[in-house]
């Protein structure tokens, strides 16, 4: 018996369902969040990405895109400390075939963006799951995939439902919110 918005093991969901409902091409992006992030998490993330992925582009203040081969965590901290938030800093890197962009908006919210159009096959989906699983393990924290800008903090104060991500990764455990499945009749 399934409750509305119940998280289910990813193994119980077909690639076709993932493609249609999680990676639906609707003009919006999907966000990857590490909620309640700390600067220590950001440092771990930067080290993890620098070791495992190739940085495609890194943009600092003034809007000038520069090519660097690694994320400079000290520069991130400097921008957070001097500006309160690093609005003009982002890094682009590839996870397999998927371009990922990370924005350094706030030091307490680690966010990556991806275009769901780029998740073109089950094999490419697995590349993303590998990234999310390894990141969750490196941080020892839950990593979630959501609709664009969908975090608990972004919800209206009048909304009283339970917030659930599209997909949740906690270590090696991956769960999907199978919102398209009808709840069991009571």
Feature-to-residue mapping (PLM):
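Generic structural motif
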Residues: 37-40, 96, 107, 117-119, ...
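Acidic, proline/glycine-rich low-complexity IDRs
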Residues: 1-9, 114-186
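Long, contiguous N-terminal structural blocks used for assembly/anchoring
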Residues: 1-79
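Residues in intrinsically disordered, low-complexity segments of regulatory proteins
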Residues: 14, 28, 41-44, 79, ...
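Short, intrinsically disordered low-complexity segments
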Residues: 55-108, 112-114
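Generic beta-strand structural signal
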Residues: 30, 108-110, 139-143
């Amino acid at each position: 018996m399934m409750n509305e918005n119940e998280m289910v093991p990813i193994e119980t969901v077909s690639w076709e369902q993932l493609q249609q409902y999680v990676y639906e091409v609707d003009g919006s992006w999907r966000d990857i969040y590490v909620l309640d992030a700390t600067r220590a998490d950001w440092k771990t993330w930067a080290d993890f990405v620098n070791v495992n992925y190739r940085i495609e582009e890194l943009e600092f203040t003034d809007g000038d895109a520069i090519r660097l081969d690694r994320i400079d965590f000290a520069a991130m901290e400097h921008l957070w400390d001097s500006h309160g938030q690093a609005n003009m800093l982002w890094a682009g890197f590839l996870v397999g075939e998927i371009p990922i962009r990370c924005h350094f908006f706030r030091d307490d919210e680690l966010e990556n963006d991806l275009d769901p159009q780029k998740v073109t096959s089950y094999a490419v989906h697995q590349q993303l799951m590998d990234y999310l699983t390894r990141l969750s393990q490196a941080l020892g924290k839950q990593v979630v995939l959501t609709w664009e800008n969908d975090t608990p903090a972004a919800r209206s104060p009048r909304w009283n439902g339970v917030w659930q991500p599209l997909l949740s990764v906690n270590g090696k455990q991956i769960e999907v919110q199978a919102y398209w499945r009808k709840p069991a009749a009571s």
